């Protein structure tokens, strides 16, 4: 329980710091655990989540107002950070972000410990 609360506090602190710098954070990956984590930490710093599944695109993360978009929009949205909700697929997603979507920002991997990877 204490570790979970520490993760929540650290994630909220990080997202607040990013927000104060007027930087954009969008999510990537819309598995069920994304809904759980967002409802745990709050949605106030996330505008969109990208997911490759056309079945999810255009819909919303359950219990939130966060819309799911096609990852091809990354090049137009130009987020500063991408919060990785499908952290168990981080290697594959990092490859996609760099090679297929030309993402040149930072990636936040929240679990098991918060890591920030600079893809620039």
What are these regions (language model features)?
Residues 1-120:
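Hydrophobic, well-ordered beta-alpha structural blocks that scaffold small-molecule cofactor pockets
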């Amino acid at each position: 329980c204490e570790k979970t609360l520490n993760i929540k506090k650290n994630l909220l602190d990080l997202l607040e710091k990013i927000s104060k710098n007027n930087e954009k954070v969008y999510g990537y990956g819309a598995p069920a655990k994304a809904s759980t984590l967002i409802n745990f930490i709050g949605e106030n710093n996330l505008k969109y989540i990208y997911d490759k599944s056309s079945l999810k695109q255009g819909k919303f993360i359950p219990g939130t107002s966060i819309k799911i978009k096609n990852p091809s929009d990354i090049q137009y949205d130009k987020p500063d950070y991408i919060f990785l909700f499908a952290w168990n697929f981080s290697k594959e997603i990092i490859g996609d972000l760099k090679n297929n979507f030309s993402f040149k920002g930072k990636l936040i991997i929240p679990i098991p410990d918060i890591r920030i990877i600079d893809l620039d």
